[in-house]
Each structure stands twice: as C-alpha cells, then as structure tokens.
C-alpha cells in the first residue's frame, strides 16, 4: 500500500526569537524541516505534503529545494494540530493509502521507527508513536492495555497512578487517509485554548470501535526544538551520532569532539581527520585522504590520497584529484586541482584548473575578478609557478611552462616557456643610510613639537 507524508511546519516558534521560521533553523547546516523530510523519505512516499504557516514562502522554497515533487499547503490560522493536518485534505483527495504525520521540528526520527509504525498499521486502524521518558514531566501519558492504546491522558487530568506511567505521547501517528480525515472531522475545539488537537483522534477512534495501538521509540528520536538552547542541544546530538557513524565506517577522527560535520558529509574509510576541522554542506572525501587541523571545507570533492591543510579552505566547486596537496593558508574556489598537483602555501586559486603534477609556489594569486565579471585561469600539466606570481585572468599556461618569482602574468604562456615580468633590480650605494637619517630627523622634529 502506498504512503503519504504530512509534515506540520506552520509554527512560528516564538521562543526561538527569530524572524526565520522555526523549522528552517539548521542542524548540521540543514533546516530541521529537511531532516524531517529525509527521515520520511525512507518510506518512499507517493505524496509529501508540507503544512506551512509562518514564513510560508521561505518554508515552501526549502521544501521544494529538497523535494520538487512535494506539495506545500497553507494553514492561515494556527488553530491546532488537527486543524493543521486537515489542511492537507485537498492535497490528498483520492489517496487511498496510509498517512504518516510528522513534525518539522522533530529531526531525529530513525527509518526503522517509521517502518515499525507502518507495520503496526497492518493490524491496527490508528498507530501512535510513543517513547519512554526519562522525566515524563508534563507529557501526555499513553495508557495501554496489552498492545491496545486505551487513551491519552494529559498531565493535568491524570491520576497519580497515571502520572507514574513513563510511556508518553510524541504526537506522531499513522492512519489510513480516509479514516484519518474522518476522525479529524469529528475533533472539536471545546477546550481552554479553542484549538483542534490531533491527540483527540485516539478517543474518537476508540469510541468508533477502531483498533488503536502505540509503537515505542527511544526518547531522543522525538526530541522537539522550541528554543535556541534546544537547537544547540539537537545539533550536539546530531554531531555525536554522525561522528560515531564515521568511526564505525573506518574513518579516523583524531579528536572527534572537535570535528563539525554537515548533514550530507560523506567521508571514505581510512581517511584521517585531524582536530578542529569544519565540514560545510556538500562535501565528499574519498578513501585514504587526510584533512589536517583547522581546515574548512564546503561544496567540494577530495579524491583518494589527497591532503588538505592545515589551515586550508576549500570553497564550493573545489575539486581535488588523487594525491593532490593543498597546504596551509591556501584557499581554493571553483577550481580543479589535478592529480599530484601541489598548492602548498599562502595561495588563492579561484576559477581555475591546474593540471597534473604542477607546483604552485607560495603567494601565488589568481586574479580572477575584474570588478564586474569572473575569469578563468588555465594551468597545464607539470607547470612550475614561482613564488609571488600574479596570474591575471583570463590567462592560459601551457604544459611544462614556468613563471619566475614575482612575475605578473597578463598574457598566455606557451608550453615549456618561461614567463618573466618584473621590474629590473637596481642597487643604489649608500642610499639606505641617507634615507634612514632623513626619516629619523623628521621623527625627532615631530617629537620636539609635541
């Protein structure tokens, strides 16, 4: 049977104290909404419906960027969770499969949990996701009778015996689409806040004689984010899990707690990551590479055996071939570095390609921007670039070419040619002594005046 996702993402998130919609706050460089969508994607949903409210256009853009087939609907007034789900009714018209309701600010659901919810749906009309709370506090309690969920009891209405229950409601559920919307139609708002609560569908389903159950997961999967402190805690949880996964995959993290990973970071086995490395979004590192300390990588690809850093920056579009070397205080942007090529010190390479085996001397700059447009620099194979060379793009250096130290290259250099363009040196005898005497006299004169 096919499955649809309904992800609730309409909340303003007042406690976040932000103009950004709560579900768009990032964990490991990816919006919480995207984490929820990726969690649900394991079910291979036939339809995905995002219910947006506050900041709807920004939410729509983020959702469609992740899944262009998603449908985004608007909850103009926030009248409760049941009302939010009901906004998906039109988008799911004619859909005969199961609906799984997720929350856009609950980013840690695991694939097996969702799969177990759908497995339970085969024998029950309505499935609620619960968790064993370390501190149940004011969560709603799930009162079970065998594998049957009898009712959800809110804390303020629970007896002392019911408050002792540690099995709590997460708010997530799975149900046949037709059944779910029929249950929601029966939900009222006769409560202090005048809202329509999704949890009420359990009582309605029981009264209709439907089979209701609850599936358990660990509490961390249901962690919701409502404040900046919650966001920081959630990010820390993600980082701990992601680091552990890399270690299990055969990646060496020399100081795991200092390495920051993005949600989509991919690192191959036998790669060594030194302390204080930051991975932005869109990074792939192949097996056997080394990322040295204090490097920052984003939107780049590092091939097998390459070495990056220390103190290197790889920006979007950086492509390092096998055994390439990028050293300290080097920045690479939108550039391909060929096999075995070396860019070892104090260099900026932007909008460029460097052929295999080439060596780029310290202080080399690709002058790629004319104030309006970017231009490319093309460096062939086995080229030697002398220290402090300025490469004024657009410019091409052929295979085997060389530049003299301090050269400003403004024209193409033929293969195997030497480019030399610098002012001829003159040594003026005794000029330095006279200049220092003049400058010291000026300094002494100013000091007397003050």
From Swiss-Prot:
GO molecular function, one term: glucosamine-1-phosphate N-acetyltransferase activity
Alphabetized Pfam families for the sequence: Hexapep, NTP_transf_3
InterPro entries in UniProt: Bifunctional_GlmU (IPR005882), GlmU-like (IPR050065), GlmU_C_LbH (IPR038009), Hexapep (IPR001451), MobA-like_NTP_Trfase (IPR025877), Nucleotide-diphossugar_trans (IPR029044), Trimer_LpxA-like_sf (IPR011004)
Binding residues annotated for Mg(2+), in chain numbering: 105, 226
Enzyme active site: 345 (proton acceptor)
Reaction(s) this enzyme catalyzes, per UniProt: alpha-D-glucosamine 1-phosphate + acetyl-CoA = N-acetyl-alpha-D-glucosamine 1-phosphate + CoA + H(+); N-acetyl-alpha-D-glucosamine 1-phosphate + UTP + H(+) = UDP-N-acetyl-alpha-D-glucosamine + diphosphate
Region feature (N-acetyltransferase): 250-450
Binding site for acetyl-CoA: 362, 368-369, 387, 405, 422
Ligand binding (UDP-N-acetyl-alpha-D-glucosamine): 8-11, 22, 75, 80-81, 103-105, 140, 154, 169, 226, 315, 333, 348, 359
Chain positions covered by the region annotation Pyrophosphorylase: 1-228
Record text on cofactor binding: Binds 1 Mg(2+) ion per subunit.
Subunit composition and interactions: Homotrimer.
The name this protein goes by in its record: Bifunctional protein GlmU
Organism: Ruegeria pomeroyi (strain ATCC 700808 / DSM 15171 / DSS-3)
């Amino acid at each position: 049977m096919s499955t649809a996702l309904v992800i609730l993402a309409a909340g303003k998130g007042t406690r976040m104290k932000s103009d950004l919609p709560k579900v768009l706050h990032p964990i490991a460089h990816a919006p919480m909404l995207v984490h929820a969508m990726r969690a649900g994607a394991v079910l291979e949903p036939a339809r995905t419906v995002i219910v947006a409210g506050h900041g709807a256009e920004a939410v729509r853009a983020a959702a469609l960027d992740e899944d262009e087939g998603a449908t985004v609907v608007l909850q103009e007034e926030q009248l409760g969770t049941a009302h939010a789900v009901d906004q998906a009714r039109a988008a799911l018209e004619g859909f005969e499969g199961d609906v799984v309701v997720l929350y856009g600010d609950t980013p840690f659901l695991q694939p097996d949990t969702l799969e177990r919810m759908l497995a339970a749906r085969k024998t029950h009309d309505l499935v609620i996701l619960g968790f064993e709370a370390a501190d149940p506090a004011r969560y709603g309690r799930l009162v079970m009778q065998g594998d049957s969920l009898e009712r959800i009891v809110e804390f303020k209405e629970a007896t002392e015996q019911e408050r002792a229950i540690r099995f709590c409601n997460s708010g997530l559920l799975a149900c046949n689409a037709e059944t779910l919307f029929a249950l929601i139609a029966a939900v009222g708002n006769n409560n202090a806040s005048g809202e329509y609560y999704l949890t009420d569908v359990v009582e309605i389903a029981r009264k209709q004689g439907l089979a209701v159950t609850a599936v358990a997961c660990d509490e961390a999967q249901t962690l919701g984010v409502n404040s900046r402190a919650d966001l920081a805690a959630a990010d820390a949880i993600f980082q701990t899990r992601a680091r552990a996964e890399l270690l299990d995959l055969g990646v060496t993290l020399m100081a795991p707690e200092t390495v920051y990973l993005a949600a989509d970071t991919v690192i191959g086995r036998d790669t060594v990551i030194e302390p204080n490395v930051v991975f932005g979004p869109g990074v792939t590192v192949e097996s056997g590479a080394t990322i040295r300390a204090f490097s920052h990588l984003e939107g780049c690809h590092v091939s097998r055996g390459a070495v990056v850093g220390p103190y290197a920056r790889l920006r979007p579009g950086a492509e390092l071939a096998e055994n390439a070397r990028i050293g300290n205080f080097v920045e690479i942007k939108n550039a391909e570095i060929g096999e075995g090529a070396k860019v070892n010190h104090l260099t900026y390479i932007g909008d460029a390609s460097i052929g295999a085996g080439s060596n780029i001397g310290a202080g080399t700059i690709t002058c790629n921007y004319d104030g309006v447009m970017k231009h490319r620099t093309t460096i062939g194979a086995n080229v030697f670039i002398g220290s402090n060379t300025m490469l004024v793009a657009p410019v091409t250096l052929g295979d085997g070419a060389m530049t003299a130290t301090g050269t400003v290259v403004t024209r193409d250099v033929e293969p195997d040619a030497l480019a030399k363009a610098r002012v001829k040196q003159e040594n003026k005898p005794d000029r330095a002594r006279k200049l220092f005497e003049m400058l010291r006299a000026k300094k002494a004169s100013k000091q007397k005046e003050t």
